[in-house]
Amino acid sequence: NTNSPYTRYGYGDLSDQSFGNSKAMGGIAFGLRDGAQINPLNPASYTAIDSLTFIFEGGVSLQNMNISGGGVKLNAKNSSFDYLAMQFRLHPRIAMSIGLLPFSNVGYSVSDTQTATDPGTGATADYARNYTGDGGLHQLYAGLGVKVLKNLSVGVNASYFWGDINRTRVVYYPSVSGAYNYNHQSIASVSSYKLD
């Protein structure tokens, strides 16, 4: 979950794709190769696991956010599922990892009030705008790492993405009777894949 007005754009707040050990080191992941951790950002690192090891790892995130602007202050506390993954050896030179993790999160509710002026009569009317959104994208991946030479491994991840992002925009005139209100809702349903 998230409470950020910046998630109004694009896919929302992109999730950190690194796992526990990498996050503890500031998000570094591409150069890490360790047989005791899962590193989906470097699928070649899967081959570091030994034949007697099976890794099952999960994570959650806690977030405390302070937002201020225009004299308004907001404190938001969020918790969310981070990832669930496993890694194991298939062959002395081949290892595999499978996992589920969020790709992006959308969550916002922003309102403001403006004044509109009729250019013909000069009459004014207040109107309010509300922007809300929720949802996000999820990622399921399966990756293979192959040890080609003693000091050379290659790897690939195949990922499937799915999810919905709902956005609503409402404009209404609370002080004008008989005024037409504007309501627009968009739902983006995503179903796609990638190789990396």
Regions found by a protein language model. Give the residues of each.
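Subset of outer-membrane beta-barrel
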Residues: 1-196
